[in-house]
Amino acid sequence: HRIARRQRQMCIRDSYINTIPVNEEKKSNGDQNIERRIRSLIRWNSAAMVVRANKKFPELGGHIGTFASAATLYDVGMNHFWRAKNNKFGGDLIYFQGHSAPGMYARAFLEGRLNEKQLDSFRQEVNPGGLSSYPHPWLMPNFWQFPTVSMGLGPMLAIYQARYMKYLINRGLIKDEGRKVWAFLGDGEMDEPESLGAIGLAAREKLDLSLIHI
C-alpha cells in the first residue's frame, strides 16, 4: 500500500501533456490580421537591424534568427498574457532569451520607445546611446529588468525568483496576486549546465507560478 501511494505521488510530478482537443480550444480575442502584420514588421526590423549593424562592423554578430524562431510566442505573450506593474498589481516577470534581444528592440522601435539612430547602434554600447547586445539592466536600466546572458543564467534566475516569491507568499510577507514568472530558453541554451541546474528545485518547491518555454 505504501509503495502504491508513493507511486501515485510521483506521477503527480510527471511531464504535462496538453489533452485539450483543437475543437475545444478557446479562440484568441485579438485581431489576428493586425497581430500578424505587427509580428511581420517586428521580425523584419529585428533582422534588418542586425544586418545594418554588421555592414558597418562585420565583427558585431547578433544572432539574426533567434528572435524569428520565437516571434509568435513573444507576440502572443505581449498582447494577451503579460501584465505590467501598476499601483495595484506587482506585474508579471519576464526573463527573455538573451539572443532574442533584437526582437525586443524592434518592438520598442515600432512602439516609439526607441528611434532609428538607436537601432543603428545595436551592439555598440560603448558609444553613447548604443543598445546592449543582450538583456542588460545595468547598461539599460530603463529597458531591461533581468540579465539573461551568459547562456543558462536566465532559467536559473527565473526559478530562484519564483522560489523567493513563493517563500514570501507562504509567510504572508506579500500578497498572492497570481503573478507569474516567465522564462524563455533556446538557441542551444539547454546544453549549458546552468540551464538545468535548478530545475529539480522547481519540482520540489512546487513552483506553480513559473512558466518555462524552450
Residues covered by each model-derived region:
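Flexible, glycine/charged-enriched surface loops at secondary-structure junctions
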Residues: L60-G61
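Single conserved hydrophobic/aromatic residue that forms the stacking wall/gate
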Residues: H1-R8, I12, H213
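Cofactor-binding active-site loop characterized by glycine-rich and histidine/acidic residues
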Residues: G30, I34-I42, S46-K55, T66-E205
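Flexible, low-complexity linker/boundary loops enriched in proline and small hydrophobic residues
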Residues: P21-E24
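Terminal amphipathic helices with adjacent charged low-complexity linkers/tails
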Residues: R13-T19
